Amino acid sequence: MTNSTAPVVVIGSGLAGYNLVKELRKLAPEQDILVITADDGRNYSKPMLSTGYGKNKSADELAMSSAADMAAQFNITVRNNTRVTHIDTDAHRVFLGEEPVEYSKLVLAWGAEAVSPRIEGDAEDRIFSINDLEDYAAFRAAADGKKRVLIMGAGLIGCEFANDMTVGGFECEVVAPCDHVFPTLLPQDAANAVQRGLEGIGVKFHLGPLVTRVSRDGDGVSAALSNGVEVKADVVVSAIGLRPRLDLAVKAGIQVNQGIVADRLLQTSAKDVYTLGDCAEVEGRVLLYVLPLMSAARALAKTLAGTPTEVSYGVMPVTVKTPACPVVVNPPAADAAGRWIVEQEGNDVQAEYRNEAGDLLGFALTGAKVANKVALNKELPAIMP
């Protein structure tokens, strides 16, 4: 049963959680807000994790403010280093172990988790996923004084880290079981341009094989690939993908699919429970990018402040942080019928995805062609008007 005097409880202190807090505080200055987070609650921008080496930034330098700073600035309570273990949607309570906490409205903003590689070997402690600030700090400590990095995965995360770490002085080799980089995001011509750009700064690619085993080799590792090649490295970064965190929602009986299922009000199947960010599936869409969560934070803040507001997603291009070959992509919907039309000059690629009527449904730009983003954006339909 709802207790109207209980706080709005937000689980998660990433970009989604803290941006919602900022927007809600503008509209409801007196609303009691509690943020519960499993990490230390520092405010930082997750996309900056893949720029840290190029800018020579430590984890502390990437953090913009502490949990205490956020609590003071926005007049909220932050319970950091605290895990929610159970959600009782009927009683409007979350549990921190044995401790119950009542909520009037609950927001699930706990993001996505790194997919763990299933590989053999005895070097698990030398394989790192970098999905949050604490992960980044742990990797920097392990990689201090090291030179060779093996990156598993050639998608957005893997390629961004390869660019950043190479600029930061590492020798990077990328292994992925795909024909080209960004296999789910870019058409092949654009992907090949990015690969050439990264190879131009020293990144080495092994596309096609899987990493089957990572074994200790002195202070480093030896990685066996499925094609028989052996790669030596000091540390390994696993960047094979992210998936929305669903476990607590499933245990609470909240409907999930690829993400936590929500309508355009960002309400889940449970009364007074909402979701946004990387864990959310809104009208069938899981969008693991910053622009959608910013739109969601603004809409949900209005709803929580008493004005039900549906979220809308406009044209939301993704800028990939690979300075060796800049990329902007607005991928077509998965079910969009059409074909890629490509113009190319070296690593400068303009790929337009158009239907039979000639309507633009998506684009991918690399190199100097990224300058055409604004013009193409004007042609595109909104993702979710």
Language-model features: locations:
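A Rossmann-like FAD-binding core segment of flavoenzymes
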Residues: 30-32, 77-95, 101, 168-262
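Phosphate-coordination loops involved in phosphoryl transfer and adenosine-cofactor binding
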Residues: 5-7, 81, 145-148, 208
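Beta1-alpha1 glycine-rich phosphate/pyrophosphate-binding loop at the start
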Residues: 2-76, 164-185
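FAD-site-proximal beta/loop scaffold in flavoenzymes
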Residues: 123-144, 219-222, 229-302
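Glycine/serine-rich phosphate-binding loop and adjoining beta1-alpha1 elements at the start
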Residues: 80, 89-90, 95-141
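Mid-to-C-terminal Rossmann-like scaffold of FAD/NAD(P)H-dependent oxidoreductases
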Residues: 2-7, 13, 26, 279-373
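Glycine-rich Rossmann-fold phosphate-binding loop(s) that bind the pyrophosphate
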Residues: 12-15, 131, 153-155
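Rossmann-like NAD(P)H-binding beta-loop-alpha module
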Residues: 138-186
